[in-house]
């Protein structure tokens, strides 16, 4: 499955990925109309300090703790991506507490929001990746690490 991979060596901390994400998920066709004088609610965010910055978004884990924690069944896997059923989300924030990466946040209307890889936007790649001027975000598929038997493990 393709995922977003940040490269902190190339991230300038410009936050353009956040703006492109907010615009792509705004439903507007005009960026100025979508973002001017409004608080943005991106599904990706830039973290770091003066030494290093990087973009943080949902990792779409193979065994997501957020789905297990969701009491309303609003989170589910779809083609490998963790997706939200906004009509089912009750805003309890149990998934926010369960996510070890802090990639889920409460949105402006009380329900949660997280990166859904722009799968519903039909752009071919997430807007944050397409908009990053320094190519600090990559949308690619990496081979899953093979599980190996530990040395000295007993077998029957």
Report the location of each language-model feature.
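A positional/architectural concept
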Residues: 12-24, 28-30, 43-44
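Conserved C2H2 zinc-finger inter-finger linkers
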Residues: 77-78, 108
């Amino acid at each position: 499955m393709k995922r977003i991979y940040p490269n902190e060596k190339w991230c300038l901390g410009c936050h353009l990925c956040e703006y492109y994400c907010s615009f792509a998920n705004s439903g507007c066709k005009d960026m100025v109309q979508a973002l001017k004088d409004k608080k943005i609610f991106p599904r990706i965010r830039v973290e770091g300090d003066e030494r290093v910055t990087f973009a943080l978004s949902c990792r779409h884990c193979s065994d997501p703790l957020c789905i297990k924690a969701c009491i309303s069944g609003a989170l589910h896997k779809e083609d490998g991506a963790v997706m939200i059923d906004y009509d089912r989300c009750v805003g309890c924030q149990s998934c926010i507490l369960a996510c070890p990466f802090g990639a889920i946040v409460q949105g402006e209307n009380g329900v949660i929001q997280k990166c859904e890889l722009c799968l519903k936007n039909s752009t071919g790649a997430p807007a944050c990746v397409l908009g990053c001027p320094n190519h600090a975000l990559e949308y690619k598929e990496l081979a899953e690490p093979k599980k190996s038997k530990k040395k000295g493990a007993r077998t029957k």
